[in-house]
Design a protein with these regions (language model features):
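Charged catalytic cores and adjacent phosphate/nucleic-acid-binding surfaces used
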Residues: 1-37, 43-91, 128, 143-321
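Short, hydrophobic beta-strand segments that form beta-sheet elements in well-ordered domains
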Residues: 36, 110-113, 132-137, 156
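N-terminal active-site wall of soluble small-molecule enzyme domains
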Residues: 82-127
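NAD-dependent ADP-ribosyltransferases
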Residues: 118-125, 136-137, 147-150, 169
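Short, polar loop motifs at secondary-structure junctions
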Residues: 138-142
Length: 321
């Protein structure tokens, strides 16, 4: 993956393709790196079952019960939609191509988990369709569970948690939070709710400052918009400057939307491998993806791999099949 300059890992999709397209267009105009656009689908509470569509006349109670039971069994299969893929032909990416960049979009799923749903969610086949997995956690017990076996999670987000800092219990568990950071799980702060009224703004700053404090100066944190409309997006340098209000130096603040964001994307990509050691890609496509810690593109990586005799032999055998 090429080095990115600025990335917003939380541009929300609310079911309106035109609105999502407008959000991405604005992000592009504001200067976010062309390589990264993350479209987020937030499904709320994973374990919550919506049975509104099961209401029937009183004389069909048995049928209601049957449908309710079927819904409870299959709810985790139907609650997760397919990722939303933006039609790139509707975007003007000519400037990026002239600068030697390529447009890439990533899908993201955000969900609220609890102790009873984490196992089902981890093994839900539809989850694997998404590039980035972000979760909201209600308490430190679940956070500790993710620290031990959370290799399927990329982000723990404060997005959607509209509470005072005193009500987010895990924000006072520095050792647990730091242990999550040590295993590669990042924490996300979203600034859009700070633009939606004084109470939301107070909640945003209190939670953000506490998270900055317990992560020792923003280590393992990204800053995203969480925007579902263009007016809530801010330019990269404005977002970087915002971090100074948390008590961070300016350059450290900019890492929250650049270097740290890229680390999240690299972790997400290695989730498609076996412990990050083996990567499977389709070489029949025009742009096969080969992960690189040095920032080289796939063509350079393939040329280097082709210098290895064993690799060339394997490729020759595959071409003969």
């Amino acid at each position: 993956m090429k080095k990115i300059h600025f990335a917003d890992l939380n541009i929300k999709h609310r079911g309106n393709p035109k609105q999502t397209l407008a959000n991405v267009k604005r992000a592009v105009r504001m200067g976010y790196d062309a390589v990264v656009k993350v479209i987020n689908i937030d499904i709320g509470n994973y374990s919550q079952v919506d049975i509104d569509n099961l209401q029937q006349p009183p004389n069909k109670k048995k049928k209601i019960q049957q449908k309710k039971e079927a819904n409870e069994e299959s709810s985790t299969e139907t609650i997760i939609p397919d990722p939303f893929i933006l039609n790139e032909s509707e975007l003007d990416i000519s400037t990026f191509l002239q600068n030697g960049k390529s447009f890439r979009q990533f899908s993201r799923l955000t969900v609220t988990l609890d102790e009873n749903s984490v196992h089902k969610f981890q093994h839900d086949a539809r989850v694997k369709k998404y590039d980035i997995i972000a979760v909201r956690v209600p308490n430190e017990q679940l956070l500790l569970t993710l620290q031990r076996k959370g290799d399927f999670v990329d982000l723990v987000t404060l997005d959607g948690i509209n509470s005072d800092v005193r009500d987010v219990s895990w924000l006072f568990k520095q050792k647990i939070v730091q242990s999550c950071v040590n295993v590669g799980i990042y924490f996300e702060i979203t600034y859009s709710k700070a633009l939606q009224g004084s109470e939301r703004r107070r909640q945003f700053f209190s939670c953000a400052r506490k998270l900055i404090e317990i992560t020792r100066g923003g280590n393992g944190i990204i800053l995203s918009s969480g925007a579902d409309e263009p007016i809530l997006l801010r330019a990269p340098y404005d977002v970087g400057n915002l971090s100074t209000l948390f008590g961070l130096p300016l350059m450290t603040g900019r890492k929250l939307i650049s270097e740290n964001a890229q680390n999240v994307l690299l972790r997400a990509q290695t989730r498609k491998t076996i412990k990050g050691a083996i990567h499977v890609t389709n070489f029949s496509t025009k742009t096969p993806i080969i992960p690189s810690a040095t920032g080289q593109d796939c063509v350079q990586m393939f040329k280097q791999l082709s210098k290895i005799e064993e690799f060339r032999a394997e490729m020759n055998e595959m071409n003969q099949v």
